[in-house]
């Protein structure tokens, strides 16, 4: 299965590592508020960074193995489908963490 990606801040990722799972959907909304965690394909990450993360420092891109998530992953949206994780993201499902900038 192809990896999916999520952009977050270093601080939020560090908190998730300490907790064992990640529960933030977007910069401003939690998993509980949104109902899922917003993700992107590799090709969608640059556009996501441009649209939502301009001027934000200390960003990281989480590379996620969907087979390790343990929650439903659905591709949704029109005209372009984005991957959504319908549950918390286990830290163990993140196979790489890379610094990125918008």
Language model regions located:
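Conserved, structured core segments of small domains
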Residues: 1-102
